[in-house]
Amino acid sequence: MPKLKTHRGAAKRFKVTGSGKIRRNKAFKSHILTKKSAKRKRGFRAGDLVHERDVAGVRKMLPYL
């Protein structure tokens, strides 16, 4: 059986925490920032975890994670 391929876009966006959860960055922080409040932009800096319903799909894209 051939090796499974890693989804390269997903590999750049997700990392695993020490406890095995999948970490992600928040969206909406790269441009059109003038209308967003400072508080909202600070919130984008904080990382977040992938929702439990999405974990299976991410793991399928990243078989060697």
Curated annotation (Swiss-Prot):
GO cellular component term of the entry, any: cytosolic large ribosomal subunit
- GO BP: any one term: translation
Identify the domain of life.
Answer: Bacteria
What is any Pfam family matched here? Ribosomal_L35p
What keywords are assigned to this protein?
Answer: Ribonucleoprotein, Ribosomal protein
- Which PROSITE patterns does this entry report, sorted A to Z? RIBOSOMAL_L35 (PS00936)
Q: Which GO terms describe its molecular function?
A: structural constituent of ribosome
Listed InterPro entries = Ribosomal_bL35, Ribosomal_bL35-like, Ribosomal_bL35_CS, Ribosomal_bL35_sf
The UniProt entry, under NCBIfam families, shows: rpmI_bact (TIGR00001)
Give the UniProt family note.
Belongs to the bacterial ribosomal protein bL35 family.
Q: What is this protein called?
A: Large ribosomal subunit protein bL35
Q: Which organism is it from?
A: Magnetococcus marinus (strain ATCC BAA-1437 / JCM 17883 / MC-1)
